[in-house]
């Protein structure tokens, strides 16, 4: 099953995704896309790391997400990807539109063939005002397009607000 868990910053989306991974009763691999480039991000990573069960495997991959999913997906495994918007940020910061398109398309193209459970976590960025800066507008647009394409392919899509899940597609939680 493919699941997409959306929400704003500190909405409870990662905690929900972690609970779903635990509830799957499968072997879990956590795929982290962040690059802790400053102290605050390092603290966030440490917080997430401390909350995860020790038996979960960890793969850190900031760019080649489709490759890691193809290599790691198994029928008896749950892959938890946290998060897609950081992955998108990493690609945007390369300032290589062709690479971004190739990586995004590779991700979307591989999903149907992946066995097991895949849970994606991502920040919902499209509910605010239109950003003033060009790069920020592009980020919000790319995230919105990615979320739409993923939601089409996922069996369950959940929006998390204030720690509460709102199922948008699929079986309610």
Regions found by a protein language model. Give the residues of each.
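Conserved P-loop
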Residues: 2-72
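A generic alpha-to-beta junction signature in SAM-dependent methyltransferases
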Residues: 72-73, 114
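Short, hinge-like loop/turn segments at secondary-structure boundaries
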Residues: 47-49, 75-76, 137-138
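A short, aliphatic-rich alpha-helical micro-motif
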Residues: 73-74, 151
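Residues at the starts of beta-strands that form the adenosine-phosphate
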Residues: 26-29, 77, 117, 156
